[in-house]
């Protein structure tokens, strides 16, 4: 699909669900990716993969994670899964390679530095697929919260705390902030769709 690789402005959006936030102890249990163009139009959704872990690993999670992942259905999907970290990484890289060259896209999402740390340890090939830069929507959210609270309060996530719903929320959230970015918002901020 060489024609699909032409756009260097394409963006890879990613989200991980983990057993917790400790990058030395916890583990990735779900991954999802979406590729957009520079105007945040979705070009393709990658595989949404629950990663196999034993019941003991899930039971060792803190209460918030146990409750959240049971409620979202991820708990059972992880127990039913036969996908390993290596398989999830390979499937995700294979998908991305159809849409964008390695090293062309920053890692995009919310609190993406945390995801990058987990990827570095558990899916290093995938982590290296991204440019070293990050497009972290959380940064814009934190600035808006401080400088323009009404803008920050104007967006409500609909997420079910699954990887794919969180990726979609991140894209929607950046679309929301883009309309308030003045000259940085480009044609979209001026009401012109690209």
UniProtKB/Swiss-Prot annotation:
UniProt xrefs under SUPFAM superfamilies: Ribonuclease H-like (SSF53098)
Domain Exonuclease: from-to ranges: 11-174
Annotated Gene Ontology cellular component terms: cytoplasm
Subcellular location per the Swiss-Prot or TrEMBL entry: Cytoplasm
Active site: 132
Main location per the UniProt record: cytoplasm
NCBIfam families attached to this UniProt entry: PRK05359.1
HAMAP family from the UniProt entry: Oligoribonuclease (MF_00045)
UniProt-recorded name of the protein: Oligoribonuclease
Provenance organism: Xanthomonas euvesicatoria pv. vesicatoria (strain 85-10)
């Amino acid at each position: 699909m060489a024609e699909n690789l032409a756009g260097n402005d394409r963006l890879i959006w990613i989200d991980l669900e983990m057993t917790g936030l400790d990058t030395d102890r916890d583990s990735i249990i779900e991954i999802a990716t979406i590729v957009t163009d520079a105007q945040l139009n979705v070009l393709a959704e990658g595989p949404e993969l629950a990663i196999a872990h034993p019941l003991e690993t899930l039971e060792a999670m803190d209460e918030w994670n146990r409750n959240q992942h049971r409620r979202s259905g991820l708990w059972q999907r992880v127990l039913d899964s036969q996908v390993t970290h290596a398989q999830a990484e390979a499937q995700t890289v294979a998908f991305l390679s159809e849409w964008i060259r390695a090293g062309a896209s920053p890692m995009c999402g919310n609190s993406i530095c945390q995801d990058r740390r987990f990827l570095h340890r558990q899916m290093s090939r995938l982590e290296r697929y991204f440019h070293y830069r990050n497009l972290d929507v959380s940064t814009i959210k934190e600035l808006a919260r401080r400088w323009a609270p009404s803008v920050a309060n104007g967006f409500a996530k609909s997420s079910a705390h699954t990887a794919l719903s969180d990726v979609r929320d991140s894209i929607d959230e950046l679309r929301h902030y883009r309309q308030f970015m003045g000259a940085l918002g480009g044609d979209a901020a001026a009401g012109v769709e690209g």
